[in-house]
Amino acid sequence: MATTYSNFSENSPDIVLNVGNTFGIDADFEVPAFAEPNEYVPEIDSTYCFDKNTTLAILAGFSDNRRVMVQGLHGSGKSTHIEQVAARLNWPCVRINLDSHISRLDLLGKDAITLEKDKQVTKFQEGILPWAIQNPTALVFDEYDAGRPLSLIHI
């Protein structure tokens, strides 16, 4: 079944937060954030402890629109770290599990048949990548090493 993502492109970060105060690490600079969360913002885990170097790398991605790769052993908390940074910034975050059967069509989009006024109509339904380009979103590509080459080429 196709997933429909709602657009919120009129939103952009509208506040700045002090990194030291927000993440409890020794850093004195500000990072853009959203005043209010939306449906794509992860829940805050108030017990989460941030690793300084990893947090600073992730924050560089949020503040400077950079791509960040976090690597580590399976189950070491890479995706959770990104989600917890996003949660404190009220920044939308979507996790894509690449070890599942995700296809090029899921990533880029496809024609879908819908009903309009009791008639079948074919409409293009965007995939997650075009949607994310149009909306301020952190995409987390989980299990990247297990991704199928025909899907990874589009990322």
What is each PLM-predicted segment?
Residues 2-153:
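AAA+ P-loop NTPase catalytic core and its hallmark functional loops
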